[in-house]
Amino acid sequence: MTSAKVLYFSGEIPQGDPEGDQRTLFRKLHLLSKERDHVVLASLLECVTLTLKDECSKLSPQYRDLLPPFESVLDLTDHVVQLRKTPLGGAIERVLVLVFQLGSLVAYHEAHPLEYNFTPASTVIIGRGSGLLSAAAIGLSPSIVMVPSIAKEIARISFRFGLVVDKVCRSLEVSSDEINSDGAWVYCVHGIGEKEARDAVNQFNEIKAYPSTNGASVFNVDDAGNSVSIGGPPKTLEALFSESNIFKKTKNVAMRKIQGMWHTDRVYGPEHVEQIVPKIESARELHVPLISPVSGDPFRETEAGPLLEQIMEEILMERVRWDMIIETVSKQLKQLMPKSVQLVSIQPSHYNQNMLERWKSELPDAAVSGLTMMPAILELALEQSPPKDTRSSKIAVVGMSCRFPGSDTTEEFWERLMLGEDMHRHIPPDRFDVETHVDPTGKRHNTSKTSYGCFVDNPGLFDAMFFGMSPREAEQTDPMQRLALVTAYEALEKAGYVDGRGVIHRKRVGTFYGQASDDYREVNSGQEVGTYFIPGGCRAFGPGRINYFLNFWGPSFSVDTACSSSLAAIQAACSSLWSGDIDMAITGGMNILSNSDVYAGLSQGHFLSPTGGCKTWDEGADGYCRSDGVGSVVLKRLEDAEADNDNILAVVLSAATSHSAEAVSITHPHDAAQALLYNQIVRRAGIDPLEVGYVEMHGTGTQAGDPTEMRSVTSVFAPPHIQGSRPIPLHVGSVKANMGHGEAAAGIMAFVKTMLVFQNGIIPPHIGVKTGLNPALPDLDKAGVVIPFRAANWRPTGTKKRLAMVNNFGAAGGNTAMIIEEAKARPRLCEDIREAHAITISAKTAVSLSLNIKRLVEYIESAQDLSLADVAYTVSARRRHYEYRKSVVVRSLAEAIKHLQPHIETAKSQTPTLVKRPPVAFAFAGQGTFYVGIAAQIYRDSPFFRAQIDQFDNLARRQNFPSFLPAINKTCAHEDLPASSIHLAIVCVEVALARMCMTFGIKPCAVIGHSLGEYAALAVAEVLSDSDTVFLVGTRATILESNCSPYTHGMISVRASVDDISREADGLPFEVSCINGPNETVIGGTVENLEAVADRLSKVGYRKTRLDVPHAYHTAQMDNVVNELIRQSQGIAYNTPKIPIMSPRDSSVIETGANIDSSYLPTSLKKAVDFAGALNAAWEAGVVSKSTVWLELSHHPVCSGFINRTLPNTSLTCSTLHRDSDNWTSLLKTLSSLYEVGLNIDWNEYHRPFEHALRLVSAPTYAWNNKDYWIQYRGDWNLTKGQVLPEAELPAVSGFRTSSIHRLYSENYDSSTAHLLGECNMTDLSLKGVIEGHAMNGYGVASSFLHAEMAFTLARRIQEKASLSTFTGMGINVTNFEYHDPVVKDASSLDPYPIVVDAEANLEMGEVQIKWFNPAIEKWYCHAIAYYEDPSTWLSNWSRTTRLVTSRIDALVAMSNKGMANKLTTSLAYTLFGKLVDYSSMYHTMQWVILNEDEAVAEVVFPADTQGDWAVPPHFIDGVVSLSGFILNGGTHFDNVNNFFITPSWKSMRFAKPLAPGGRYLTYVRMIPEGVDDKGRLGSYVGDVYILQDGEIVGVVEAILFRQWPRIMLNRFFQPVGMAPPAPRVEKKRDAGRGTLPSSSSLQEKTTATAVTAKITARFPGSVITPSRSAPISKSGSSPKIVPQLDYSLLTPRTSPNSDERIEKTDSDSGFEEADGANDVTSRAVEILAEELAVDKGLLTDECEIADIGVDSLMSLVISQKLREDLGIEVRDAFYLEVTTIGDLKKLLS
């Protein structure tokens, strides 16, 4: 007997609400189709969807416009009711019936694949109406996988079937709306037979005289023959049942859900079949009988095409005889006589029950049952298999971090929410000045009407060194981008992300961040545009920098959709995960407010509340309150997160973004667009919207936005037609009421809040309603919507997961929303039975290490229900590790606290581990300390270790050795173990331990084995294969047992050297077996001999220990064993070692690649083990060193002591196992020690055997060593930009202009002080001759004497204007003059080159402080002090010196006359001077020079015209003073061929009488050495210059200093600003094809005279622009031009000099004062590096890694250019790729 199946497909859609019953099933089918076990279902839905879209594309426009957009055919379920009112209603319904039936059947049989066993002999298929099409699909599909392909064609037929029926029916009766709007086209009539019904219908049609097409017809007879179905136009049927006496008596039901009528040949014919059924190429045939509902017989056609045509003919034109179908099926069942009959149907129906009852009565011996697909599908469990593809995955949120107002952590953020805090406050001063930038009236230009916002505290705080950024780069990088980097890192820490761990690869990780403003770039860093202005401020660099720092290769997107930017970024991240582009995303948003313009613009646009915070849903809502915010979350596909053992905070089911395209304005919300979006994400998520329990609303607090959003939310999640029947209340909230509107960060704020709501099971109180609810909101009570004014519980209940929606809108019209589901709790699948755990903590600095320890201790102390194993797993396996480290091995949390607390302080002084990880040498012990149960616990718990051991044991047994597992798992006593088992256990355990350690990241640099341990060493060095190792060890042991009598010989370990033992043995026989250390020796021999030697040794006090071994290894007892072992091991192949092997046999090192003789191991059994000799040989060969870490792989530490005593400088020696300790604890202590010395332990591998028992805990994130990097917005230029302001161009003081001071910015006097600020334009025509006539290196130079003239000029101006009687007749002494960074002019440039001169006088002291500022290099470069003194006093003092000076002059003249000194003419003197200075004729004032080595006198005659308006003409000063320079640069006594000499300073310059035009003077000077440089060379010379007129000293320049410099430095000192220096003489090799850097002159902003004020004001904002008291009216007739009155304190150097150092000396100008830069290139290069990075030079040690201090590609460009310019050396622009540390850079430069 067999089993029979009857498959029944009705033509009905599910009964009840089509948006209820259908939607429930279709949601289930949608969710099932995402799973890997339901790929056929997914294929079916896809095929039908594609077919439907294809058919719809062929419709006329008026029909196409009736269809809503849809992603899947299932989406149309939401539109069934609306579509019924259109001509497409029937077509869509027919397709949905097909999907409903085939989808249910396919889904069920994918879950129960064995039940799809429909055989022709025992299966029959029946169907009604359009159900015949579904029946045909199954009949034509022998396999379930074949269903989708035929369903594609049948879906086309179904759709066309509906269209044709609608078209035909509308031709019979006009209907402008739903085809059934005027009545039903079909009635079901009970209590009447077919004949009676047909006669009555025919009679009625004749009486009414309808056209034949419009009459009624009987088309269906039920199985009992007493019910019929009658079809016809609604008006015809209405008349029939109201007028016919026969039908008035019957019970009839109008079938309003059936769209039109068919089964009548009065209106349908073959032409309609042709329109519906396409030509089908498929050659499929029925594989089971399909019964015709017309004839009751199987369809005559069996091939797909003809069969479908026949089916369509019967559906359209033939009457249904259901009674005949049932009769045929019953007859076949009776003939088959099955043991069971199963009726398989799609949905419950009275037909099902009728059939089952009949068969039960007719087949009493058969088990008759029914299987209904619909309830069976609804009962199928979800998530029983992984997603079928990435598109079907859920997205897990696994980590998050934030910087929100008042909240630096998510915990603080939650606390603020639960306390109901409103974080709005006045704009803090670090953003901009509220007093000037806020005007509540809005009348003032560019001001905001509101002063409120919600702000992150100290947004500039950042750990630049951690992220490898220089302070300079950090300062110029937008704080929101920095905080995005910080929060991304913290979120990854919370997620437990470690590169290379789990299923995520860094090449498939992307970043997505929302950012909608550029405040910092536009305002803060824009004030001082620098190297990092672009990468620090442009939006793309925000996510790009995260990718770069974390080494992620995936995409990085910066998203701007205005206020929805961050949620849109999260949605983009989800989409990228769903598309399979990436496997992990870091996403979020950022917003830091500092630009007053945005405040002003939003105020003017009426976005902002003038009264404070966001009043969401309040009747007085008046706009939003702006907010800072930066947040990051980490997303993965759910299956990946589960595989990685992540903490899953919540799960994103669906997310989408749309646009309010039909809103009244671009910024206005649109509820229809919002509702459409919600429906879309609900469908994608496959959820019932009524089960959503919480919606985090956008809720900005505006009168337009709040009601619109509430209407759209309630229309979907609490719709009017179900109000009051929601299964759960719908809570709504908005974080903006607490935190303000974060704009680009608003979405991430809402998202993080929702994560916390899920985590804590509480909905925080809503504080936005300050007065009363906005009356424009819908009736929330009626809708079941709850605004929680107090915290509301929302905890998990039952099996259903909580659902929430996060909503976010953008001001530009974008809408983003997502459905979020709570994460299910994952059970621990095993137990972690390890006794101890390592708590590892690391940092990049000692400060952070201390803070990390402190925070972890506080966390452990405060956390509840915390597991030590979880904490250890989190901080070791799930964290990154850095150079500063601490690790403690503990057995409890209390012990962890106890051991960690002391290190909070000690960590502050801890030194980092080496950048280069220490090498590790493996040592393998012999058998001396064997015990049963070695590595038993590791064998039990570690799959890797167990697999290794099992493989070795399998090899041993296959080579006929006994299993050695009993020696490990303690199933045998020690004395019962054969030697082969013991030896194999030892060696195999050691090799397995070594390999396990390698999986932990510990790779050996060399190996050494002691005795038996050499076999393990050679195996690890890959000299021996596993098989050969087992063979050699097993054979060796077997031969030992058979050739040596046990315990006739022995071994004794003695704490003495070989020489000591030999001396004390005094001829007694013994053999040296092992030399383990300098004073550690093992001797062997017969028992008798050993006892005699032992007695001798005991008497002299040597410690000795008898070893528990049965033989005397490495003695003559082994002779026979060695020979036999050599014989039996001839077939063993020794490979060349992959790493060096320290050989105790030969006291040598076997290098990598060396050949090893096959007798090596056999003979080592006889030879002494010189372990110490091997160690020393390795030390001498450099194979090991003091930095080498030693790891002993053994069952008990033996070799460790030998190593420590032989190599006492060894840094660390440790071992894996200890016989008296738990295996895991011993191993862990070793790993902990190795970790602390800098090895990168793979803690994931260590924890892998127990990971299913471990959970990631929310341990504290990294403690940053923050510093504040914030460029303050200075002044109020945001208010005035774009306005035409008066220019500062005219001289400030009427009539005051000299040849050196071209205008005064300001001039102020009071009773005791005076202050002048002036300008000297180096391109002014008045200076042309003076500067170009003093040329050096081919360029005109503003000499020190020109600066002296300016000092005389300003001091005289003050003297004249102060009008103090005490100054009358006073002379001016220019003292303490210092000149750095010479001002060099390019004669070809006509661009203005202004120099600012500042003079500040203390009139009571008679002192003027004068300093010069060069805007081109932004540096104070020169300084002097002028004193008002009595010239008569000078003359009196000088008179005492006159005789001495004149005597020296006379002596020189006499020497010249005798030819003992050189007398030079004017021409010759200036020709010689031309070696350094090319003087023009106006400087040629020396008439003759007498020169004798370091002493000279000259006659100077000045021209009759001063050629300008000067206080003291600079060329006159040069004429009388430059003799000092001529001695050095023009004579032959000093080396001025290779060097040059220039003056940076003098002590004083006084002229008691004016240097008069036409005057004749003598000048005398002697230059003497002034000390030596740091290399013992003469480096500077000093002299006093005397100026005499008519035998009287009238002027003295005291202590004028000249410094000696190599001539190669001329290019450095005398090069115009912005011009590239010529190529150096010797270049280092350059990269071929490397482009050259453009000269900075091409990039430098041209400076105009007017721009000086602007530049200084920009550099030192806060300067008050006020008219000078003497400001004149412009001669041009234009508006008065105001000269700025500057705040002089702001013109001081950034670092105020002390009293002894009045000018700003930087490393770049210290060349005149410091050691010779050309001879100390590397030192100067490091100084340049420190300058450009803005770091302390002390940080730049040789070990400092350049990446850690921020040397990247851009900074590398800057530094390389500076090295060219300042030092004349050539390095690659990308030198940062060639070096790692500062030490490397020094080597490169040297």
From Swiss-Prot:
GO molecular function (one): 3-oxoacyl-[acyl-carrier-protein] synthase activity
EC identifiers of the protein: 2.3.1.-
Domain Carrier: 1716-1790
Designated gene of the protein: gsfA
Effect of disrupting the coding gene: Impairs the production of griseofulvin.
Function in brief: Norlichexanthone synthase; part of the gene cluster that mediates the biosynthesis of griseofulvin, an important antifungal drug that has been in use for a long time for treating dermatophyte infections. The first step of the pathway is the formation of the heptaketide backbone by gsfA which is initiated by priming with acetyl-CoA, followed by sequential condensations of 6 malonyl-CoA units. The resulting benzophenone can undergo a spontaneous dehydration to form norlichexanthone.
Residue ranges, annotated region (N-terminal acylcarrier protein transacylase domain (SAT)): 20-263
SMART domains, per database record: PKS_AT, PKS_KS
Protein's name according to its UniProt entry: Non-reducing polyketide synthase gsfA
Pathway: Secondary metabolite biosynthesis; terpenoid biosynthesis
Domain Ketosynthase family 3 (KS3) per the UniProt entry, residue ranges: 392-822
Pfam families found in the cross-reference section: Acyl_transf_1 (PF00698), CurL-like_PKS_C (PF22621), ketoacyl-synt (PF00109), Ketoacyl-synt_C (PF02801), PP-binding (PF00550), SAT (PF16073)
InterPro entries documented for this protein: Ac_transferase_dom_sf, ACP-like_sf, Acyl_transferase_dom, Acyl_Trfase/lysoPLipase, Ketoacyl_synth_AS, Ketoacyl_synth_C, Ketoacyl_synth_N, Malonyl_transacylase_ACP-bd
Biased composition (Basic and acidic residues): 1699-1708
Record remark: domains: Multidomain protein; including a starter unit:ACP transacylase (SAT) that selects the starter unit; a ketosynthase (KS) that catalyzes repeated decarboxylative condensation to elongate the polyketide backbone; a malonyl-CoA:ACP transacylase (MAT) that selects and transfers the extender unit malonyl-CoA; a product template (PT) domain that controls the immediate cyclization regioselectivity of the reactive polyketide backbone; and an acyl-carrier protein (ACP) that serves as the tether of the growing and completed polyketide via its phosphopantetheinyl arm.
The keyword Cell division is assigned to this record: no
Catalytic activity: 6 malonyl-CoA + acetyl-CoA + 4 H(+) = 2-(2,4-dihydroxy-6-oxidobenzoyl)-5-hydroxy-3-methylbenzenolate + 6 CO2 + 7 CoA + H2O
Annotated stretches, region: Product template (PT) domain: 1298-1615
Positions of modified residues (O-(pantetheine 4'-phosphoryl)serine): 1753
Keywords: Acyltransferase, Phosphopantetheine, Phosphoprotein, Transferase
Residues covered by region (Disordered): 1621-1648, 1686-1718
Region of interest: N-terminal hotdog fold: 1302-1435
Active site: 563, 698, 741, 1334, 1518
Source species of the chain: Penicillium aethiopicum
Root EC class: transferase
Region of interest (C-terminal hotdog fold), ranges: 1460-1611
Coiled coil: none
